[in-house]
Amino acid sequence: MFSRVAKTSFSAVRAAKSQFSHSLSQQTSKTWVPAATCSKRSYAAEAKTSAAPVSGQIVAVIGAVVDVQFEDDLPPILNALEVQGRTSRLVLEVAQHLGENTVRTIAMDGTEGLIRGQKCVDTGSPISIPVGPETLGRIINVIGEPIDERGPIGTDRRSAIHAEAPEFVEMSVNQEILVTGIKVVDLLAPYAKGGKIGLFGGAGVGKTVLIMELINNVAKAHGGYSVFAGVGERTREGNDLYHEMIEGGVISLKDDTSKVALVYGQMNEPPGARARVALTGLTVAEYFRDQEGQDVLLFIDNIFRFTQAGSEVSALLGRIPSAVGYQPTLATDMGTMQERITTTKKGSITSVQAIYVPADDLTDPAPATTFAHLDATTVLSRGIAELGIYPAVDPLDSSSRIMDPNVVGERHYSIARGVQKILQDNKTLQDIIAILGMDELSEDDKLTVSRARKIQRFLSQPFQVAEVFTGSPGKLVSMAETIDGFESIIKGECDHLPEIAFYMVGNIQDVKDKADRLAEELS
C-alpha cells in the first residue's frame, strides 16, 4: 500500500512539474529576445528610474566610501548623488549595490562632517560637466565646478563623464601625421592623429614648456583646441602651469582667444576625484571633437596617478587586489578610458600622457598596461638638457609606430633613419674621442662627428611660448622644411657652415642667414 501511495504522489508531482515547465516555456518564449538584437546601449537603458528625484539617507561613512539607503528605486551604478544640507557641494558616485536597498558610493570630495541620517538625492544621471568653447582658459574640477575664482562658466551645454567609445563605423581608418611644428618630433617620432603618446621626463628637463608649445602650435597650425588634465599632480605645479600659460599667451584673461581648458584633480583630493578627473578632461575634449570637428590635443599628467587612484578606490570597495596590489580591473579601467581617445570621421583626439615609472621598473603592471595603448614615445633626456639643447628630446630613445615608409613616405623614412645612424655612430665614437682625442679618428669618422654635432644643434628650436624668457622669436617649422633641412646636412651640403649657425634656429635657410651674419661680424 505504501508503494502505491508513493507512486501516486510521484505521478502527481511529475504532472505538476511538467505543467509548470510548459507554462514557463510559453512565458519565456514571449519575452525572450535574441542576444544578437541587444546592444550594449539597450542594456544601459534598462535601469529603472523614476520621474521624481529619488532620495535616500546615509547609513555609513568609511573614509571616502559612503553607504546610502533608499526606500524604493535604487539609483543605477555610476549615477551621481548629491548630499543635502552642506555648504560645499558633495557629489557621490554609485559604485556597488549591496542589498537591503543600500548602495555603496565613492565621494568626489572630502567626507569630513558627514553624519548618518543625512539626506542624499539621486540626480538621475552620471556626473555631468559644462562643455564647449566657454571652458577654454578656465580651470574646472572633477564635477565641473570652476576653481579659478573667475565666476561661473557661462554655458548650458553639459555632458556626462561616462560614455562609450565610438563605434567601429564611426572611426577613421586613415593614418595621418599630426604636424606639431617641432623638428625633432616631426622627423624622428611623429605623432599620429588620434594617437596616444607617452611623454617620459624628469623634473626640470622642459616637459611643461614642450606641452605649452604643442598646445600653441596645434592652435596656430590646425586651429585646434587643447585640454590639460592634471591627475594627482602637485597643486604648486598646477598653479605654476596656469601662470606660465598666461605669460606664454596660451591663456588670455582679457578676451576669448584662450586655446586650452584645464581640468585639475590635485594630489590632496580624495581617490574618487583623482580616479575620475581624467574622464572629466576627456569629456571636454570629446565635445570639441564630436560637435565642432576639431583635432584636439589632450594632455594627461600623470597617467600613473589615474591607475593609483583606481587602486585606492578598489581597496576601499573591498575588492581582492591583483598583482603588486593593483585593482583586479586595472586593464578594464585603462582600456575603457583609452578607447575613447581616437580619431572619428568628424575629428580626432591626440593624447600626450606623462608617465611615471615606479622605481624605474617598466614591468610594473601600471606602466606595462599603459604601454599597450601607446603609439609613440617622446623621451626627454637630462643629458641633452645639460648641453643647452631644447627641446631635450632624445632622438635615439624616442620612437613612433607610424615611422613607416607606407605612412610617412620613403623619403621621410630614409632621412630619419640616416639622421639616427649618424647620431648612433657619433655615440659609439665618443669613447675613442674621450681616450685618444679627435686627431686619432679617420677622415670619415671626423666627418661623421662633425655632421652629428650639427644635427644635434639643428634639433634644437626656439619656442614661441619661451620668447619672453629667451628674447629670441619662436619658430614653427613645417614638415617639408624639416625634411629638406636634415637632408641637406646628411648629404654634406652644409659641411662648410659653422656649428654655431645650427643652434636655436628654424629651417635650413635660417642656418645660412645666421652663418652669413656671423661671417659679417667676424670680418
Swiss-Prot record:
State the reactions this protein catalyses: ATP + H2O + 4 H(+)(in) = ADP + phosphate + 5 H(+)(out)
Extract the GO molecular function terms from the UniProt entry: ATP binding; ATP hydrolysis activity; proton-transporting ATP synthase activity, rotational mechanism
SMART domains reported in the protein's UniProt record: AAA
Provide the leader sequence positions: none
Q: Which GO terms describe its biological process?
A: proton motive force-driven mitochondrial ATP synthesis
Q: Which PANTHER family match?
A: ATP SYNTHASE, ATP SYNTHASE SUBUNIT BETA, MITOCHONDRIAL
Q: Which NCBIfam families match?
A: atpD
* Assembly and binders: F-type ATPases have 2 components, CF(1) - the catalytic core - and CF(0) - the membrane proton channel. CF(1) has five subunits: alpha(3), beta(3), gamma(1), delta(1), epsilon(1). CF(0) has three main subunits: a, b and c.
Q: Which family does it belong to?
A: Belongs to the ATPase alpha/beta chains family.
- Name the chain's protein: ATP synthase subunit beta, mitochondrial
What species was this sequence derived from?
A: Hemicentrotus pulcherrimus (Sea urchin)
